[in-house]
């Protein structure tokens, strides 16, 4: 008889093994056999919990997306009554959390983005992630800007976040949080200050 909680432990073990294998060989070559070997289990265990490789890859992406959502939510919770600028900066900080900028996470995200163009289930996850970021930014900018300006500011900052992350992921240098923060902070200030200047 299986121990209580063993299923969730085993699933987490397999997800971590999947992320490690993707980091080593890429998503295309991350076979069930390699993942099972990394996790120290039989191939059948993966089929039992996730049906197939696609099911396991989807679970791995949901795991990273959960970490992203948690990183953002925790920062926003601390700043529940703060001004828009601080909460927008918190959203940026959450997206640049170490859980999203480690070598393993970056390689997994890159592989995920590429695969999402051809796999409907991964594409849906990508759309959910994009909408969540845009919605969060749009709401916070909307506390200080008109609806149209908030939408443009949110789209611009979302593109800036993705662009800074992507450039770092494709470079050989570690992610520079200080540099990314400086660039995004200047953009946030520019958007909010422009509005204030026009109102005065």
Swiss-Prot record:
DNA-binding region positions on the chain: 31-50
Molecular function as annotated in GO: DNA-binding transcription factor activity; transcription cis-regulatory region binding
Pathway assigned in UniProt: Amine and polyamine biosynthesis; betaine biosynthesis via choline pathway [regulation]
Keyword entries, A-Z: DNA-binding, Repressor, Transcription, Transcription regulation
Statement: the UniProt record of this protein carries the keyword Repressor: yes
Cleavable signal peptide: none
Entries under Gene3D superfamilies matching the protein: Tetracycline Repressor, domain 2
InterPro entries: BetI_C, DNA-bd_HTH_TetR-type_CS, Homeodomain-like_sf, HTH-type_TetR-like_transc_reg, HTH_TetR, Tet_transcr_reg_TetR-rel_C_sf, Tscrpt_rep_BetI
Coiled coil regions, renumbered to chain: none
GO-annotated biological processes: glycine betaine biosynthetic process from choline; negative regulation of DNA-templated transcription
Stretches assigned to the HTH tetR-type domain: 8-68
Task performed by this protein: Repressor involved in the biosynthesis of the osmoprotectant glycine betaine. It represses transcription of the choline transporter BetT and the genes of BetAB involved in the synthesis of glycine betaine.
The protein, known as: HTH-type transcriptional regulator BetI
Biological source species: Proteus mirabilis (strain HI4320)
Gene encoding the protein: betI
